[in-house]
Amino acid sequence: MEQLFREAQDALAAAGPLCQESQDVLARARQNLEVAVHLGIRTQFLAKAHAHQWTLASKFYSNALTRTKKSLETVTRQQTRFQAARGALEEALGELAATPVQLRVNNGAHNLREFVDEDLISAQVQGKGWNEVHEEALNVFRVLLPEIQRHGDIVNRSKKEFEREKAEQTELLIHQTSDSGIYDLLNSAEACSEDMANLLQSLARHYDLCERGQDLSTGAIEAEDVNELGELRAVLENDAQQLPDVLDELQERLDEVKQGCQGVHNHMTQMYHSYSLEVRQLEGIQAVEKTMDATLEICETQQRDTKEYLLKVQRYVSETSAVVTHYQTFLNSYKALLHEAERRNAAEAKMKDYVTEVNAKLAQMSIQETNRRQDFVAQQGDYLPADIWDELLLPSRRFEARELDGEL
């Protein structure tokens, strides 16, 4: 009986640590699972936030690139407006130069261009400094557009790289085990641990029986009947033969517990890697945000410079258009002046013809009047005293139409 007691004692001593180890492994597995769950929640939250931030960053550079290209198109159109205004001025001045002066003028000018105040329009005609203004405006875009494109490409590459790593992590998680599989592993490990506890209880009962048998054999306690010790010995000897198998089964169950809990640990480790990836993404996004701030500042400067450039061009175009309108009006007025000169010449010629005609009629009327007076004197003069009227013998007066100081 002493031998059976020692064997039971040794078996119980060997089983205790195995069961305790099982409980310790399970406790760590439960903690690991809890950590994995929290990491999963954080990872999912960060993943959604990062996906949104990557999308915003991509849209930012896409919009910045589109907006800058539109600004470049606007600047290009303004250069076209500038050239058109300058061309219109050159054309207007060319028409003045090609229009000869057909009237006598005091300054001896040969064409209408000579009436232009060259000092007043020299800035519009020569366009001094405008090449530099145009080039400065274009240089902004030559620097900014490639910079925006480069940063946008960096964002897209970084986004794709993180997406690739996330896909690999996700694929690895899927291949390892699913979320439901993790709980299955833990449940299986807990079931094995319960089996180990049951086996440990069996060993404890066997030990208690061996202890009673030893007490019975030494007379420490009295048997309930005369056959108790013999029957108990037979049972204990039979159970003692199964002790190695029980210990082996405990070890097998412990191995199964460890295996299942290792899966939980692996899952937690992988979730930690996924979470770490999202944290690294955050660092990448923060770097992108700094770049976005710098890009935004450059874009705002470009918009401000472009606005100033557009105002300069608009001012030049407005001033030049006013000059063109003035000289076009001058040309049209000169053409109207030529028609006015023709009209006046025709009117003067007509008035001169009328004066000639009137003078001829006046001369004829004067002759006729003189003849009529002479006929009167011839018929009635002999009967009238000579001093009766001083003008009796006077001839008819002569009248004449003539130009006086440019007026009739």
From Swiss-Prot:
Ribosomal protein among keywords: no
Source organism, top-level taxon: Eukaryota
Membrane association type: Peripheral membrane protein
GO cellular component terms attached to this protein's record: Atg1/ULK1 kinase complex; phagophore assembly site; phagophore assembly site membrane
Keywords tagged on the record: Autophagy, Cytoplasm, Membrane
GO BP: any one term: autophagosome assembly
Keyword Ligase: no
Function field: Autophagy-specific protein that functions in response to autophagy-inducing signals as a scaffold to recruit other ATG proteins to organize pre-autophagosomal structure (PAS) formation. Modulates the timing and magnitude of the autophagy response, such as the size of the sequestering vesicles. Plays particularly a role in pexophagy and nucleophagy.
Family: Belongs to the ATG17 family.
Protein name, as recorded: Autophagy-related protein 17
Naturally occurring in which organism (per UniProt): Yarrowia lipolytica (strain CLIB 122 / E 150)
